[in-house]
Amino acid sequence: MRAVGVFLAICLVTIFVLPTWGNWAYPCCHVTQLRAQHLLALENISDIYLVSNQTCDGFSLASLNSPKNGSNQLVISRCANGLNVVSFFISILKRSSSALTGHLRELLTTLETLYGSFSVEDLFGANLNRYAWHRGG
């Protein structure tokens, strides 16, 4: 009977805890100004998680992830200004808007909505020291 309880506990952890581990468990990160050798090359970025400004005290953040040395394991993660990331993708998608597929048009609309949700009032109400820019190595 004890083995069944342990098995159920492991299953519950697998179902409910592991999917939220990593970026989703702690979506708010510190934006750090990095030296050039520590930046992620654009072609190496595998995932980008955008975090709404309502989630992180008025700050729009993004987590840029890359596998290390071609492995499937996500090792390298960088925090970025979410508004800059969203603006970059909006700019790229608008340049070729006539050739966009339905999914890319939907992405453009979603990004524009996210960008439009940012307000100066959110920034003034934010704890400016919480996600401050840090000079990193």
Swiss-Prot record:
GO cellular component: host cell Golgi apparatus; host cell plasma membrane; membrane; viral envelope; virion membrane
Keyword match NAD: no
UniProt keyword annotation of Signal present: yes
Topology in membrane: Peripheral membrane protein
Example GO biological process: symbiont entry into host cell
InterPro entries (UniProt xref): Herpes_gL_rhadinovirus (IPR020175), Herpes_gL_rhadinovirus_sf (IPR038313), HSV_GL_alphagamma (IPR034708)
Disulfide bonds: C28-C56, C29-C79
Cleaved signal peptide residues: 1-22
Location of region: Interaction with gH: 23-128
UniProt KW keywords: Disulfide bond, Fusion of virus membrane with host cell membrane, Fusion of virus membrane with host membrane, Glycoprotein, Host cell membrane, Host Golgi apparatus, Host membrane, Membrane, Signal, Viral envelope protein, Viral penetration into host cytoplasm, Virion, Virus entry into host cell
Main subcellular localisation: virion
Pfam families: Phage_glycop_gL
Function per UniProt: The heterodimer glycoprotein H-glycoprotein L is required for the fusion of viral and plasma membranes leading to virus entry into the host cell. Acts as a functional inhibitor of gH and maintains gH in an inhibited form. Upon binding to host integrins, gL dissociates from gH leading to activation of the viral fusion glycoproteins gB and gH. Fusion of EBV with B-lymphocytes requires the additional receptor-binding protein gp42, which forms a complex with gH/gL. The heterodimer gH/gL targets also host EPHA2 to promote viral entry.
Quaternary structure note: Interacts with glycoprotein H (gH); this interaction is necessary for the correct processing and cell surface expression of gH. The heterodimer gH/gL seems to interact with gB trimers during fusion. The heterodimer gH/gL interacts with host EPHA2 to facilitate virus internalization and fusion.
Sequence similarity: Belongs to the herpesviridae glycoprotein L family.
The protein, known as: Envelope glycoprotein L
Gene: gL
